[in-house]
Amino acid sequence: MDIQIKKKFLASLLFFSLFCLKAETLSEDHQILLSSDAFHRGDFASAQKGYMNLYKQTNKVVYAKEAAISAASLGDIKTAMHLAMLYQKITNNRNDVSINKILVDGYAQMGQIDKAIELLHKIRKEEKTIATDNVLGTLYLTQKRLDKAFPLLNKFYNQVHDEDSLEKLITIYFLQNRKKEGLDLLQSHIDRYGCSEQLCQKALNTFTQFNELDLAKTTFARLYEKNPIVQNAQFYIGVLILLKEFDKAQQIAELFPFDRRLLLDLYTAQKKFAQASKQASLIYQEKKDPKFLGLEAIYHYESLSAKNKRLTKQEMLPIIQKLEQATKERQQILAKTKDKEDVQDAFFYNFLGYSLIDYDLDIKRGMDFVRKALALDSGSVLYLDSLAWGYYKLGNCLEAKKIFSSIAKESIQAEPELKEHNKIIQECKK
């Protein structure tokens, strides 16, 4: 057993064993030792209990004070305040800094900010530290007394450069409509000290909110170049995506073990369908999610048809086979999970169905798939077009025309394929 762990274990065991005895059988010194040890080990509940026993047995108010400090450390501010006030009542001492700090916390939590501020000024006379300035500045900020809050928080920030006080200063700048100074401070801090994941995210949100994406790009580019780790790359990529600089985002993403779906999105955004198809295939192999098998097939189709050519039947067959496998596996998963089909399922059904129809592979079966798509998304003009095209292929032009009559003319004109199909169907005499 590690020596340090062993010591802690023995100390805990000793503490437990002694407290199992009646407190009265232990000497006052022993109880002080045990309570102090518990406090310094972070066991504030045991420390509070120990000091309260000492107070009850001896009536020495110093133990009530220690119990108050333990309760405050535990987060039990109600008990801490009760004991702090008891201490003041018995001793008539209103200048004890530890007790007054407890009361400040209590007043602040109860929303009695004026009382907390008044007491803090008293504490500052005894203990003028930057930590006290920070608390006082924060209390002024909650009251929106910005002229008093800023110098205190600024003084604290300039010495410790922590993110909490940074955020408070930026808040003040924004409340005073000094956006540029707030953003400059944010950028300057990240340039000098970097940022935690939380601050980086807040910074990105802030830059985006104020439509300062170029400033965000400069900030996160420098951060990434200075320290090219996953987190910094992630935020830089986020900015590049917002700016639609997908190629640069892709180059960086390829250097890190991000979720493959990020690269998939970047490839599709750039219409790099061959790479998107390969990426979807890798995701399918890793996650066994049939949706990615379907995407692999569709992106492969897009990559082959990118040269504005119509695919041959032989080229379409493996694409159709993968889509059929994807829909079959998807049904098996849904049967187990009891989940419902969604709009992406509808998309796959329509793509598969239309392919079977358009290439005269199995028109009726293709129409069945299209009907499944329409059952999930009845308002899709693309799916209605697929069904109409199926009727046309079967020679039922009357039904095909009927379906097209339900589609708004604007929608038909907006889609070249619908426009072409409509023209052919309207000219049909069958």
Predicted regions, residues:
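C-terminal structured "cap/appendage" subdomains that terminate the fold
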Residues: 397-398
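Alpha-solenoid helical repeat scaffolds
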Residues: 14, 24-362, 370-371, 375, ...
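Classical Sec-dependent N-terminal signal peptides that target proteins to the secretory pathway
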Residues: 3-25
